[in-house]
Amino acid sequence: MLGLIGKKVGMTQIFQKNGIVIPVTVIEFQPNYIIGKKTVDRDGYSALIAGSVDLKGSKVSKPIKGQYKSLKDIEPKKYVIELKGLDGYDAGDEIKVDVFKSVKYVDVTGTTKGKGFQGAMKRHNFSGGPSSHGSKFHRHLGGTGQATTPARTFKGTKMAGRMGGNKQTIQNLEVVLIDEENRAILVKGAVPGAKGSFVVVKKSKK
């Protein structure tokens, strides 16, 4: 499956000829290289391993260096993904942004913005308690326990806690523009993560 590792630059808007405004997210791509292959005989399935963004020298361990010995002029990469069903590439080849030329829709995976410790109303969209009439709770989640049996709170109950910082995929985002010169694409709508965060862009599954 077609895919690239990119960086979310931010959002802007594009005006169509009829005056309609389209909100778009700009995703910029640093060079993506094929750094390895997985085969059916050795791994049980076939796939390409792609990497992007050079890893700082101080963070490169000996095992990682060993993986790149056979690759000429390619530094160890910080972000690595697997691409299944993508043929015609060998180790050391670069995947360029023009692979999305024939793609109309993409799925974008990123890490959502971290919100820290949040209450149940913000985290789970609970209604909270009454706002007036002598209520002693307003933004609480209500009861979490059970009756005499089982006399405990079940694991996984929705409560206050750490919010955000999760892996999330937005599907079927329309590709509005491909800028080969600046190695970027513009997709309609928002994608997960803050400005400058890295995302994985793949051809839409649906």
UniProtKB/Swiss-Prot annotation:
Entries under PANTHER family matching the protein: 50S RIBOSOMAL PROTEIN L3, LARGE RIBOSOMAL SUBUNIT PROTEIN UL3C
Q: Where is the signal peptide?
A: none
Keyword rRNA-binding attributed: yes
Q: What does this protein do?
A: One of the primary rRNA binding proteins, it binds directly near the 3'-end of the 23S rRNA, where it nucleates assembly of the 50S subunit.
Top-rank taxon of the source lineage equals: Bacteria
Name this polypeptide is given:
Large ribosomal subunit protein uL3
Give the gene that encodes this protein. Answer: rplC
- State whether it acts alone or in a complex, and with which partners, per the record: Part of the 50S ribosomal subunit. Forms a cluster with proteins L14 and L19.
Species of provenance: Borrelia garinii subsp. bavariensis (strain ATCC BAA-2496 / DSM 23469 / PBi)
Record GO biological process:
translation
Keywords, A to Z? Ribonucleoprotein, Ribosomal protein, RNA-binding, rRNA-binding
Q: Does the keyword NADP apply?
A: no
Could you give a GO molecular-function term held by this entry? rRNA binding
As for family, the record states: Belongs to the universal ribosomal protein uL3 family.
- Region: Disordered; residue ranges are 127-151
**Any single Gene Ontology cellular-component annotation:** cytosolic large ribosomal subunit
